[in-house]
Amino acid sequence: MVDYLVQDHRFLDSFLTLLGAAIATADTFEARLRFGRFAGMICSDENTYFLRAFEALGVSPAQRSEPADTAPTAGFKAIMREAAATRSYAAALAVLNVAEGLYLDWALKAPKPMPDNFVHAEWITLHDNPAFQAFVAFLQAELDRVGPQEAALASDFYQRTVALELAFFDAVYPEGK
């Protein structure tokens, strides 16, 4: 779990850049509000979770910063910033749909009852709660609404993000480890 959390925490800055782009390029006030609330949760609850988890697992600041990014982590940081730089709402939504949709799908399949250790249990509840479920449904509806106008761009970002997700999990959880 340490390798996963270290690498996952590394793209929070790029993720916030992507959320900022979604706020800036969304075509409705309601969408901007939803993204703003979600960005607030990432900056508070989720970032605080990472810091508490690192402390509980004995992960020092040096252990968080010294290992190089895995290739998929570097790729994720790059694709989030690339999608943001397009100034395309559809591109931002494509990346967000893959990332957040996979978190929700994973969390919904997590074993019940919850693990006793907060490091595992809270990571699940951050990604399986009514607000997060509603946010992922919102992302899907927004991509369905605006994606067709930029279908090639949205599809390109979506497919590349799916490939990065698979590579990310293969890198942090190699077979046999």
Name what the model sees in each region.
Residues 21, 25, 29, 59, ...:
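Surface-exposed helix-capping loop/turn segments at secondary-structure junctions
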Residues 109, 125-129, 141-148, 167, ...:
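Short basic/hydrophobic patches in alpha-helices and adjacent helix-turn junctions
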Residues 161-177:
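A cross-kingdom marker for long, charged
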Residues 6, 30-131, 159, 163:
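Active-site-proximal alpha-helical scaffolds that flank and shape metal-associated catalytic sites
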Residues 1-25, 44-45, 94-104, 169:
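Alpha-helical bundle segments that constitute or directly flank the non-heme di-iron/ferroxidase center
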Residues 16-17, 48, 74, 137:
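A generic alpha-helix surface/boundary motif
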Residues 130-159:
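Long amphipathic all-alpha helical oligomerization modules
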Residues 26-30, 152-155:
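Structural helix-adjacent loops and short alpha-helical linkers that scaffold large soluble proteins
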